[in-house]
A protein has these predicted regions:
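Carbohydrate-active catalytic/glycan-binding domains of CAZyme proteins
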Residues: 1-490, 527-531, 570-572
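Lectin-like carbohydrate-binding module/patch detector with strong preference for beta-trefoil
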Residues: 487-627
Length: 627
């Protein structure tokens, strides 16, 4: 909490966080406050649905064990009125249609019912099955009425994630169903997964982290979300994908209508979507911006909006005073049971989370520091036993603890969580002067799990391990450093490069015969040297050092990628940035990718639909500057 995050955008690319639907759970249940040995990790807000109708905003969501909740506001910034909706309705979509309110829900067997105007409960006798089990339809429904037809966007995760569309002339059916996107992982494989029985993971519990199959898609496919139209008639999808230990992320994907179906992707490559494409044409001129203000010096009267507590906080035991965040310690056996733990989602692909910690007011048994709320959890903090002050590193997988002697000046030190979320690992560090950081403990493996479904969440915490109320910790100057946020230098404009295929680790060569092929790693002739020439708006052509250009003929099969002396015949590509010098080249007009099979011995083609999860199907490259 706060819960149900509301963001706003005028261009579907640059978003601003503007409100939450509620500040705290208002159920009379101690579990939502982490009291009495009860907890609700991962049991809060599920699958929200936002709608606008007749001047009001509506958000519908499920809370496990509490049923369907509705939040209503005249202004998207709030305040929001809370209504509890009776009935067994979950993972729903809402459709306002002809003065009626329909709720569509269920997995496999999809049901629809009409809700009463006050949203108190379904209209008796209206609940019925509209899509039977056995049609391949899953859950996560989004219902739309477009040009008189009813379209239901849904997802399935058995055996892997994909997005489906069902359509009918009547909301009650019958429906026909097709897949509108599958296998679009953007070249990302699944990450490590925590395998553990039960709910909250207590210290000493046997925890297994299953390492991923790099060739599988699993739920790294873009697979669940909704669609939206722009004022000029473009259609776009916003779908989520499971993205390693970072948790679930949102993809913006173009839609192409064909035969009355909203396929994800572009006309020449339906079902797959580009990693980089032209912005939606909404007519709004918006400067690039980050959706969240992650840094917090705690000088304000309120916390930055991005912060969320792990459960309902005890507001009497935390405060903002003197430009610092004060968290008073309460009894807890370990981090996951610690109340008033303040968290925000980790940001990838790499980031360093740093905070300044004042330990002068800790008491016997207090533990305070910087951690990662996940299962398993980890932390680096100061432990006070009697008059002894030690720095302690802890990771829950092996119940490992490492203690470090420290002598912080004026009772102040700095803690860092240095996370590499692309490679699912992190290193804790500490500093006694705020600038020179020393590794603490071992590098830890970061994982994803299906208890909270949220991935890694850096957190600030203070608790007492000896079962009593303790002192308090003061936190200051929280900041998140994102070394790869500036992508302006990622495309090697003005550089002479070699194009190395990740599948074979071999460079491309413009052969004398006129086709593009691979060559030995040691071949550094000019025929292996290329320049990317900017033609505007993310588009480019590729020129060899001998003056020829890459072109594509026919339907782009192997051998159709050739060399030409005529710049006007050069194939126009759109650069697909994968960071760390890795990239793809998508034909701007064909919507398929430059590729060379790593196994057949064929020359280059431009007919690849997209990368595989391991980036080893011959469509992903790495550029090297020619010295």
């Amino acid at each position: 909490v706060p819960g149900v995050n509301i963001l706003h955008s005028k261009d579907l690319v640059n978003w601003e966080q503007i409100s939450y639907c509620f500040d705290r759970f208002d159920f009379n249940d101690p579990a939502f406050s982490l009291v009495g040995g009860k907890e609700v990790y991962g049991q809060g807000v599920w699958a929200p649905c936002i709608r606008y109708n007749k001047g009001k905003f509506y958000v519908f969501t499920n809370v496990n064990g509490k049923g369907l909740q509705a939040y209503i506001a005249d202004d998207i910034r709030g305040p929001w009125k809370h209504v509890m909706v009776k009935g067994n309705i979950y993972d729903l979509s809402i459709l306002f249609d002809d003065d009626k309110i329909y709720a569509i829900h269920g997995y496999g067997s999809v049901r629809c019912c009409e809700l009463k105007p006050d949203l108190s409960e379904p209209v008796p006798g209206t609940d019925r099955e509209i899509i039977p089990e056995g049609t391949g339809v899953g859950e996560g429904h989004h219902m739309y009425k477009i040009n008189g037809m009813y379209y239901l966007i849904s997802t399935d995760y058995k055996p892997n994630g994909r997005t489906l569309c069902s359509r009918s002339k009547s909301i009650w059916g019958p429906y026909e169903t097709i897949t509108i996107t599958a296998d679009e992982t953007y070249g990302y494989h699944p990450g490590p997964m925590t395998e553990v029985k039960g709910r909250i993971v207590d210290n000493g519990t046997h925890i297994k982290i299953k390492m991923p199959n790099h060739n599988a898609t699993a739920c790294t496919n873009a697979h669940q979300g909704g669609i939206v139209s722009t004022p000029d008639g473009q259609w776009w999808a916003l779908l989520m994908q499971d993205f390693h230990s970072i948790g679930r992320t949102v993809d913006l994907m173009p839609i192409t209508w064909k035969d009355g179906w909203p396929f994800i992707g572009l006309e020449g490559n339906l079902g797959r979507a580009p990693r980089t494409w032209e912005k939606p044409s909404t007519g709004a001129k918006v400067e690039p911006r980050a959706p969240y203000q992650r840094n917090d010096d705690f000088n304000g009267k309120t916390l930055q909006r991005i912060w969320q507590w792990n459960h309902n906080p005890d507001d009497k035991l935390w405060s903002l005073k003197g430009g610092k965040l004060r968290i008073e310690s309460m009894p807890a056996s370990q981090l996951l049971w610690a109340r008033n733990t303040l968290t925000q989602r980790a940001i990838g692909p790499v980031s360093q989370t740093i905070v300044e910690l004042d330990i002068n007011n800790l008491k016997d048994g207090d533990v305070a520091g910087l951690g990662n709320i996940n299962m398993p959890c980890s932390w680096l903090g100061v432990v006070k036993n009697g008059k002894s002050i030690k720095l302690q590193w802890f990771q829950q997988v092996d119940n490992d603890t490492i203690t470090i002697d420290i002598n912080p000046k004026k009772g102040k030190l700095w803690l860092m969580l240095d996370g590499d979320y692309d490679n699912d690992c992190a290193q804790y560090k500490y500093s006694l002067n705020g600038s020179d950081f020393i590794p603490a403990g071992n590098k830890i493996t970061l994982s994803y799990q299906l208890i909270t479904f949220q991935g890694s969440r850096p957190c600030l915490f203070a608790f007492n391990s000896k079962g009593k109320r303790g002192g308090y910790a003061l936190f200051d100057n929280f900041k998140v450093i994102e070394p790869k946020a500036d992508r302006s230098q990622n495309i090697p404009w003005g550089k002479t490069i070699r194009i190395i295929n990740l599948a074979t680790n071999l460079p491309a060569e413009a052969t004398r015969h006129g086709v593009l092929y691979d060559t030995s790693r040691g071949n550094n002739r000019p025929s292996t040297h290329f320049r990317l020439i900017d033609t505007g708006n993310g588009k480019l052509i590729v020129q060899c050092a001998d003056g020829r250009y890459i072109m594509a003929s026919g339907i782009g099969m192997p051998g159709d990628v050739r060399m030409t002396n005529d710049e006007a015949q050069a194939e126009v590509f759109m650069y697909q940035d994968y960071l760390d010098h890795e990239f793809m080249l998508m034909s701007y007009n064909r919507h398929t990718y430059l590729c060379k099979s790593p196994t057949t011995g064929s020359p280059y083609s431009v007919d690849c639909k997209g990368p595989d999860p391991a980036r080893k199907n011959g469509s992903v490259f790495k550029w090297e500057v020619v010295e």
